[in-house]
């Protein structure tokens, strides 16, 4: 528990102190966000607000995880693990892809950033590497950081994605990992449209997964097979990483809350989407994350519905998508939308955590 608290505290402090440094640097260089002319008119006042603040989040997460790992090594209570390093690597890699996108927008004057093909190739390459490595590095119990089984509250024994001939099974599993990572990174990216919305919502998800993975650690099968125990490799390290993400998001939110002094940019949103996806795979709760991160799912779904409605029927289901803009254009103040969406995110996270805990109770008979 001490390591989790340290990770959260260090992540928060690093993020909250690094962010204003970025604000001053980017403001001095005139590196501000361009605002879509077809977006909500109230957003035009945000033109010129510094972006790429996700750098502070990534520094916060990395420093917090590293410091906690060093403390664990020194005290003999643990250290860096394959699971934690792989999820952190995924987060940083997607953050790097987002940084390239932001860099092109700001330094090269190309408003759309990376083209769709480059983003697709980048996400595909990162996903394939993560998917290949997640099934390696077994521990003494033979557990690898990830599993080829689809998972809800734990692995579903009857749903093994690596079915059929070995090559086919590997291809199916890697395709699933790509879809998962692409979906979550894009969903968080779409949610990052209002001051504080993505940072606050991600903090809620990270807080929930800090609790879930710590519970997996407390009831790990590695401590002796008992009813309801979890076959998850390195759950404590995952809890530490989630806590680091929680702290870093809260530190950034201090400056990103309305009126935002800086935006996280694709550097932050793609990275946080990767962190969400990576934690779901490593904790073997991919389907549960859909409930816990339901706000991100709804935001992404609103875009899909809007595009489908216009392409098939030439009608717009929402005033504007993602649907946080639908409510803005309906007269809600930006802060009202953000707070109410945080409430939705919190309720979804509570439902997901309750289902997780309820399943454990049903297996243990407590």
From Swiss-Prot:
Alphabetic keyword roster: Cell cycle, Cell division, Cell membrane, Cell shape, Cell wall biogenesis/degradation, Magnesium, Membrane, Metal-binding, Peptidoglycan synthesis, Transferase, Transmembrane, Transmembrane helix
GO cellular component: plasma membrane
Transmembrane segments: 3-23, 52-72, 80-100, 120-140, 161-181, 197-217, 238-258, 262-282, 287-307, 341-361
Location(s) in or outside the cell: Cell membrane
Reaction catalyzed: UDP-N-acetyl-alpha-D-muramoyl-L-alanyl-gamma-D-glutamyl-meso-2,6-diaminopimeloyl-D-alanyl-D-alanine + di-trans,octa-cis-undecaprenyl phosphate = di-trans,octa-cis-undecaprenyl diphospho-N-acetyl-alpha-D-muramoyl-L-alanyl-D-glutamyl-meso-2,6-diaminopimeloyl-D-alanyl-D-alanine + UMP
GO molecular function: metal ion binding; phospho-N-acetylmuramoyl-pentapeptide-transferase activity; UDP-N-acetylmuramoyl-L-alanyl-D-glutamyl-meso-2,6-diaminopimelyl-D-alanyl-D-alanine:undecaprenyl-phosphate transferase activity
Topology of the protein relative to the lipid bilayer: Multi-pass membrane protein
Keyword Metal-binding: yes
InterPro entries: Glycosyl_transferase_4 (IPR000715), PNAcMuramoyl-5peptid_Trfase (IPR003524), PNAcMuramoyl-5peptid_Trfase_CS (IPR018480)
Family: Belongs to the glycosyltransferase 4 family. MraY subfamily.
Name of the protein in its database record: Phospho-N-acetylmuramoyl-pentapeptide-transferase
Naturally occurring in which organism (per UniProt): Corynebacterium diphtheriae (strain ATCC 700971 / NCTC 13129 / Biotype gravis)
Organism lineage: Bacteria, Bacillati, Actinomycetota, Actinomycetes, Mycobacteriales
Encoding gene, per UniProt annotation: mraY
